[in-house]
Curated annotation (Swiss-Prot):
Main location as per UniProt: cytoplasm
Name the UniProt record assigns to this protein: Holo-[acyl-carrier-protein] synthase
PANTHER family xrefs: L-AMINOADIPATE-SEMIALDEHYDE DEHYDROGENASE-PHOSPHOPANTETHEINYL TRANSFERASE, PHOSPHOPANTETHEINE TRANSFERASE
Role description: Transfers the 4'-phosphopantetheine moiety from coenzyme A to a Ser of acyl-carrier-protein.
Encoding gene per record: acpS
Organism for this UniProt entry: Pediococcus pentosaceus (strain ATCC 25745 / CCUG 21536 / LMG 10740 / 183-1w)
Cofactor(s), by name: Mg(2+)
NCBIfam families assigned: acpS, pantethn_trn
Amino acid sequence: MIYGIGIDITNIDRFKTLHNPATFIQKVLTPTEFDEFEAKKGQRAYEFLAGHFSVKESYSKAYGTGLGKKLNFQDIEINYDGVGKPKIVKHPFSGTVHVSISHSDHHVVTQVILEGDN
C-alpha cells in the first residue's frame, strides 16, 4: 500500500549564491552526508547539495508533514549503494522508502515513495 508520494524540483544554480553557505549546509546535511559532500568539487558539490535538499523536500511531502516542527533535514539521511543507487537510510517512517534522483545541467528532480503503514 502506498502511504505517500512526494516530488520536488530544485534549481542547482541557487546553491551557488547562498548568502551563508556554511550555516545552510549544516542545517541540510547530516554529519555523514557532510563528509561525503566535502569530497566533492565544483559542479558535482552543488549537484550533491541540491540533490540531498530536494530528496528531503520530497520525503517530507510524501510523509505528509513538510519540513518544520515535526520533521527536519537532520531526520533524513541519504546514502548510496555500491553502484550509486540512492537510498534513504535514516528516516521516521516505519515502512519501505523508494527514492529517485535525476540531474540536468541546472536542475535536480527527486521523487520519494513511502510504502506500507506508519
